Every structure is written in C-alpha cells, then in structure tokens.
C-alpha cells in the first residue's frame, strides 16, 4: 500500500538561523503526525546543519540536485556518494527550473536517476508540461516522453522505491494550480503508462503533485486516488503552512 510523501523544496532560500528556526518549528508542528512521509530539501550548503537539526525526528533529509559523476574535475558539482555520506535520502532531479535554466535534457536526467538508484538513494523525478504544451493538448505526450527516458534505459523496475512528482510548469510559482480533477487525470495517466510495463511497480510508485500546492488547496488535491502527497515550494518555507499540507495528506489517506 502506498503512503503519501510531502517534501519541501526550499530552492535557493535559507540561512544558518533560518534552518534551525524552521526545522525546530516543523518538529513541533509535526511531532504527532503519522501516516505520511515527510522530507525537506535545503540548499546543499545547509545539508549538514539540517541533518543535525533533524536528528531524532521522522523528517527525512533530501537534496535538490545531483551530478552524474562520482568524483573528479567537475567544479561546483555534488555527487550521489557525497549526498549519501551526509545523510540525504530523497534527491530531486528533473525539476523544471533545472530543465529551463540549466538546459537539462531527458537523457541527462535519466542518467542522474540511474546514478541515484545505484547509490541507494531515492530519486524524486519531476516531470510536467509548459503552458504552451498544456494549451496544445500535449500534456500526456510530454509526461510520457519524460518517463520513457527512464523506462527505455532502465526498465519499469527502476521506479520501484522511487518517487515521481508531476509539476505542471504553468502552475509553479504562478499561483495557478491544476484542479484536483485535472491533476488526478494526469497522475492516473502516469501510473497507467508505467503499468504497461509493470503493473505491480506502477501500483506502488509514489506520484506527488507539485504545482503551487499550499495550505488552502492541499486537502482537496489529496482526496484524489492517484495523488500521493506533494512536492512543495514556497509553502515549505513556512512551518505552519507546510504542516497543514502534511496533515492533510495524512488525513486523506486514512479516510
């Protein structure tokens, strides 16, 4: 049985003071919540500090990116082994901001997926369409292409224990969000697409929604059968708002 996962992507935000303050508040807000996995992905600079601040809690440590190389002359990069060594578990790859600003391709992201699996880390594979692609009716085509980059090189088995985050690009940081019915339709398509190769893996893979999820719209989104939590951006920087989202995910899946 799938359990939801709510993960906070802090993006390029944080300070030593903020890390301690936010994690302390999260620990307090979420101390009695169960039935929902929780993870946060601070900037890499603060991973070690966050690890110590999270010690003894049920909140997992994540990261926002990884390089395909394990070591060597690759200035500014961070390897899977380094992330594992510092205690990170959930690693975001393929985020639309990486695809857009750093020109990351489907093939490069699939390679990162493989590197993470080999290292025993959990890939959080972000997929999703632009506003233009959505308007052109290409949502399923785009999502299938991005998933196929992994399926065709590593097989459906690679998604065992992995996480997919559907993040319609037109709904990221815009205040827009897919309706629960729209999001559910795409999540079902993603699951069905993987099921063509392996129904058992498809049934178990966690598929998060990641388009402007906040404390106001989360509960309704989580009532949908194929939405397994959320990848949260801005709202993850506010302990009270993030806690509402986590509690909504836990409550929805218990219902």
Swiss-Prot record:
Its EC number is 5.3.1.1. It is found in: Cytoplasm. SUPFAM superfamilies: Triosephosphate isomerase (TIM). The active site is at residues 95, 167. InterPro entries: Aldolase_TIM (IPR013785), TIM_sf (IPR035990), TrioseP_Isoase_bac/euk (IPR022896), Triosephosphate_isomerase (IPR000652), Triosephosphate_isomerase_AS (IPR020861). It comes from the Bacteria. One of its GO terms (biological process) is glycolytic process. Belongs to the triosephosphate isomerase family. This is Triosephosphate isomerase. It comes from Serratia proteamaculans (strain 568).
């Amino acid at each position: 049985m799938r359990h939801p996962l709510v993960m906070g992507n802090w993006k390029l935000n944080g300070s030593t003071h903020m890390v301690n303050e936010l994690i302390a508040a999260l620990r307090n807000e979420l101390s009695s919540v169960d039935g929902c996995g929780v993870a946060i992905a601070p900037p890499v600079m603060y991973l070690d500090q966050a690890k110590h601040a999270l010690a003894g809690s049920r909140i997992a440590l994540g990261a926002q990116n990884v390089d395909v190389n394990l070591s060597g002359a690759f200035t500014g990069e961070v390897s899977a082994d380094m992330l594992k060594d510092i205690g990170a578990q959930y690693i975001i790859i393929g985020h639309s901001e990486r695809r857009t600003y750093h020109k990351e391709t489907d093939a490069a992201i699939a390679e990162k997926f493989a590197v993470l699996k080999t290292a025993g880390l959990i890939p959080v594979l972000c997929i999703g369409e632009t506003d233009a692609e959505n308007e052109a009716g290409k949502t399923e085509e785009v999502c299938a292409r991005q998933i196929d980059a992994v399926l065709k090189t590593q097989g459906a088995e690679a998604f065992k224990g992995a996480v997919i985050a559907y993040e319609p690009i037109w709904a990221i940081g815009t205040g827009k969000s897919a309706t629960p019915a729209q999001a559910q339709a795409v999540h079902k398509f993603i699951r069905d697409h993987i099921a063509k190769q392996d129904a058992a893996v498809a049934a178990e893979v966690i598929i998060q929604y990641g388009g402007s999820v906040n404390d106001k719209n989360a509960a309704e989104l989580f009532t949908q059968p194929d939405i397994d939590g959320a990848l949260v951006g801005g709202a993850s920087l506010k302990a009270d708002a993030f806690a509402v989202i986590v509690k909504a995910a836990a409550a929805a899946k218990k219902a």
